[in-house]
Amino acid sequence: MLSSMNWVLLSFIIVLGGGLLLSEGASSSRPPVIKVGAIFGLNTMYGETANIAFKAAEEDVNSDPSFLGGSKLRILMNDAKRSGFLSIMGALQFMETDVVAIIGPQTSIMAHVLSHLANELTVPMLSFTALDPTLSPLQFPFFVQTAPSDLFLMRAIAEMITYYGWSDVVALYNDDDNSRNGVTALGDELEERRCKISYKAVLPLDVVITSPVEIIEELIKIRGMESRVIVVNTFPNTGKMIFKEAERLGMMEKGYVWIATTWLSSVLDSNLPLDTKLVNGVLTLRLHTPDSRKKRDFAARWKNKLSNNKTIGLNVYGLYAYDTVWIIARAVKTLLEAGGNLSFSNDAKLGSLKGEALNLSALSRFDQGSQLLDYIVHTKMSGLTGPVQFHPDRSMLQPSYDIINLVDDRVHQIGYWSNYSGLSIVPPESFYSKPPNRSSSNQHLNSVTWPGGTSVTPRGWIFRNNGRRLRIGVPDRASFKDFVSRVNGSSNKVQGYCIDVFEAAVKLLSYPVPHEFIFFGDGLTNPNYNELVNKVTTGVDFDAVVGDIAIVTKRTRIVDFTQPYIESGLVVVAPVTRLNENPWAFLRPFTLPMWAVTASFFVIVGAAIWILEHRINDEFRGPPRRQIITILWFTFSTMFFSHRETTVSTLGRMVLLIWLFVVLIITSSYTASLTSILTVQQLNSPIKGVDTLISSTGRIGFQVGSFAENYMTDELNIASSRLVPLASPEEYANALQNGTVAAIVDERPYIDLFLSDYCKFAIRGQEFTRCGWGFAFPRDSPLAVDMSTAILGLSETGELQKIHDRWLSKSNCSSPHGSQSGDSEQLNVHSFWGMFLVVGIACLVALFIHFFKIIRDFCKDTPEVVVEEAIPSPKSSRLTKLQTFLAFVDEKEEETKRRLKRKRNNDHSMNANSIISRTASRRPI
């Protein structure tokens, strides 16, 4: 489009060229009048407001003669009359009159065109109404947007849509660059937030619309769609016509959401004719301008003097128009103070284009245009709109918007949006001194009165039936009919667990969902579930699929599933036999090393306690044969806590207490393991789970129509020649009993139902996939989200479990067998080594203390023993000493204490006699 517009521009220049006069030379460096052009339609809301603001700004700049060094600022207004042709003509005329900058044009489409002229003649062009997001400074370096780009407006709308939880919107817009590119930006912003524009309604320009027929046609289309969130990004006249016809079509009632861009707030602020009843409940946005004394004074001035008793009110674009003039004035002032000139010259490129009726040299090139542009984009000032400053990418600093709700002829501000802080209920400037926090918990808006007068946030969509019922595909199964089946003698009545869950979830929805069930399959064999799911994607056969549909990756790429209503996964089932037929089953709880270690510790602990008790406890003394029997009886009777011998020593009691705790743990574990072995059936199949199933060569059964076949061939690399299709539980049982298959791989719910009737089989190993069953809907279907919420509600209230128990909890088997299968794990030493270690350390510590005391007493008693046993020779052999020590150890502790006491008494007597002898020898004779 831009290249074609350039050709249009060139043709206008050629037509105009014959009437242009040759310029006499460059202007003076500091002319008495500094000219700024402005291109607006004075018969439009924006143009009329801008014209008043321009005059006010011009008056204020010129009120101080020294501001521009004695020069006066003059705004040259060109009335484009909403005509692209006149906009081009006005720009060309300005280029003849040595303007330093141009304010405008009013529309983005003309901004695209005239920016090429500004680039060539280096004349800065500033606009506060042409806010097309695609007007890039890289492509148009001399075009500057002095108000926030519509990119931020669309970002604000996208965050509002996300905040209220909507996912689909409809966009209404005029067929021009600004509206079209704004909607494109909205689509991009929504996509980043996992939302989308489901329909774009393009309307002609408002200058073209002569009757509301096209608007009515689009609104009727929208009324028949699911989405009820409508964004209106149009010109004011078109927007007012849209709301008028929407009211007539009943589209301003409860359930609808209308979001109008800044055009609606501008209409309200400008006091233009508008039936506010037509926009009751509508949300709109307004460029946010902080409250300030300067702004309040200007508003009062506008009301009293500037509008010349006209009805036009001050809208936010009047503030931006005023600030735009000041941006140019300050930039010119900076340029002049820096010693710059304001000079104009002929463009060499245009001068080379000569002909008999062609003279383009009258178009002046602004020599200091690049310098002035640089000063413009580096402007920092406080204006009516707040702080004025540009980012390096030339976007305005801290773009923000007021969010307005129109209620009963009143403007109710529900919050703000800022690119810095997001949605808030306090002015965004209060956040600028803090670190940005865009988390969802910090996004807030006040309550809204929506169309229809409700304060409840609309769902944003409705169930679209278009006069027909929702067509729901259900598998016409030949087996496992407890999940879904045809009612006998009926062509469209369905029953089963899956159907009851679906119907219960539908009842929880806040809106009716008329539906009908349509069978898929012949009822003789189970249908292919992948084909059934594919039917949803076309929208021709089914609008949804209900049944035992596994949620697998391949299917999630083409449809949306609800929250799973039952857990599932592939399992292996194989034949079983009872382990309690083995007479030696009581030995299986422990491994052989465990039995050996346990028996050894019984003996070790018994021996340790005998050593600790032997010298002080008569029950542990006597002939060797009796003592051995005592040790064995005592230690093994601790297994049943029935030992009759009492322990006397402190060390013995400590060891016994620790050992009894260990025995308690061991016996409890043995009892539990033996109970499991005697009650749980064990598989006689060599297949322990999916790993041994893969490595074996046996044949594997699977259910016809299940995804298990593709999973085993594609994911587990099992040869298809090993797979055997089976159609019913009866075929499952026959194939397993006859050895046709070594095992069957199927989903857990089917196997649980199968095992409730066939008790000679059990699940082998654990589930090797994790998935669930859900209901399938087309991609991005809002009904899938609401049904997921309903299923969660069923789960929380316990209703889902009640439905499960009603259909799937029956069992004809006397004992559970499917929940856990395979050989029970035997208990080994590794499970108890910590306790054995504690017992061993306790025994060693106790024996160490015991022998330390014995050796100490033996050392004290040794001389006495030697005298009494008449062994006076100091050359006694080591064997003799050992025999003496063993005799001491075997001796009862009471005798040792008695002997030590007698020894101490003898020592006292000898000491007394010695003292008496020494005393007698000292007496005189």
Swiss-Prot record:
It is found in: Membrane. Expressed predominantly in roots. Firt detected in the vascular tissues of the cotyledons, and later in the vasculature of all organs. In leaves, preferentially expressed in guard cells. Glycans are attached at residues 309, 341, 359, 419, 437, 488, 738, 812. One of its GO terms (molecular function) is glutamate receptor activity. Keywords: Glycoprotein, Ion channel, Ion transport, Ligand-gated ion channel, Membrane, Receptor, Signal, Transmembrane, Transmembrane helix, Transport. It comes from the Eukaryota. The keyword Kinase does not apply. One of its GO terms (biological process) is calcium ion transport. Residues 26-591, 675-831 are extracellular. GO terms for cellular component: plasma membrane. May form heteromers. This is Glutamate receptor 3.1. The lineage of its organism: Eukaryota, Viridiplantae, Streptophyta, Embryophyta, Tracheophyta. The gene is GLR3.1.
